[in-house]
């Protein structure tokens, strides 16, 4: 009797799929990722099934309601409404890395160094993805914040004037000058508080969108809506201290438990916003008010389709072929993906961040 055996290729594929799912699930941003237009981070895997070096995410605005409906007193033919739409193109590229060990070192190690290498590689994948998401949140019209020129920052600043906030007052915004606006942020007056979170939420609701009603929130349940704000440790500290001082802390922790975006001690629920601590979000050093100038912490209030992550190739395990007659063992991973903040009118001076209100607050170090 002949028994069926699973081919090596199929075994590897099963391991690859498991590794991909585990690495996505363990990622700090996982609960905000999903495949539909309601997700904070929309995931697309269309290119895993067909050729291409980029994927376009459709962005659809609301139909214009300003003129009211057709009441039957005139023909509808010829008076149909155009559906506002655009698309954000996300190029994909290779992301890979590997680790190498030889037989002698493996023998000397008290741990299973090969398995440890796989675990370490998965952690590295998660850090790469996390860093790319953080970089996308802070990007200036597709350019990394740290490398964007003054002119590029000012163009983004003016183009997104209805969805960028400098400290606790809308008046801190200086037209045409991103740096001067940052210099208006002071401590402690512009530290993150519940009032400032509420201001950021109102900014999202009032943002000028394509025939719409502000930045679209994440929806859950029958009619519940929420935003999520990603903040660094210093901003999270200031908000927590404000809530404890004003005796809001316990109520806020209880209120968030029914929200699918709430993540326990690393989240604070306030006024329909889940504020999520992401320690790896850095500060912009020495750009705020004062002498010396204080550090400023960027915070990102996000609605639906704030970002997108596109995969052309899921995580694939790789091994080194050049093994020096079995003396060296190399294992790695490879995937093809891209992560970007979505924009309407991408690539133009009128480009707008589709689902993000960027909020800059005081980010001073602990005393």
Locate predicted features:
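Residue-level detector of alpha-helix boundaries and kinks
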Residues: 42, 105-107, 316
């Amino acid at each position: 009797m002949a028994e069926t055996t699973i081919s090596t290729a199929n075994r590897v594929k099963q391991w690859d799929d498991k590794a991909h799912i585990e690495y996505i699930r363990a990622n700090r941003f996982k609960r905000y990722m999903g495949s539909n237009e309601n997700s904070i981070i929309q995931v697309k895997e269309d290119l895993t099934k067909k050729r291409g070096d980029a994927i376009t995410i459709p962005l659809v605005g609301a139909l214009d309601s300003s003129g009211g409906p057709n009441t039957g007193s005139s023909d509808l033919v010829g008076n149909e409404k155009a559906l506002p739409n655009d698309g954000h193109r996300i190029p994909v590229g290779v992301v890979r890395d590997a680790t190498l060990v030889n037989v002698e070192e493996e023998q000397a190690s008290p741990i299973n160094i090969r398995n440890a290498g796989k675990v370490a590689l998965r952690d590295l994948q998660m850090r790469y993805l996390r860093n790319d998401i953080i970089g996308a949140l802070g990007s200036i019209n597709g350019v990394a914040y740290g490398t964007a020129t003054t002119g590029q920052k000012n163009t983004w600043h003016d183009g997104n004037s209805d969805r960028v906030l400098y400290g606790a007052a809308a008046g801190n915004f200086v037209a045409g000058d991103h740096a001067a606006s940052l210099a208006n942020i002071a401590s402690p007056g512009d530290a993150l508080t519940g009032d400032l979170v509420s201001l950021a939420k109102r900014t999202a609701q009032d943002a000028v969108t394509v025939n719409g009603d502000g930045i679209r929130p994440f929806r859950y349940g029958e009619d519940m809506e929420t935003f999520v704000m990603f903040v660094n440790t210093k901003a999270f500290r200031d908000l927590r201290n404000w809530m404890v001082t004003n005796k809001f802390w316990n109520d806020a922790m209880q209120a968030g438990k029914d929200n699918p975006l709430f993540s326990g001690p690393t989240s604070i629920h306030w006024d329909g916003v889940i504020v999520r601590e992401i320690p790896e979000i850095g500060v912009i050093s020495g750009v705020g008010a004062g002498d010396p100038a204080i550090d400023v912490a960027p915070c990102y209030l996000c609605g639906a389709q704030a970002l997108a992550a596109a995969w052309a190739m899921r995580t694939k395990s790789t091994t080194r072929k050049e093994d020096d007659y079995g003396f060296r063992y190399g294992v790695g991973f490879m995937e093809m993906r891209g992560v970007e903040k979505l924009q309407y009118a991408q690539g133009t001076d009128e480009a707008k961040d589709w689902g993000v209100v960027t909020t800059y607050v005081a980010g001073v170090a602990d005393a």
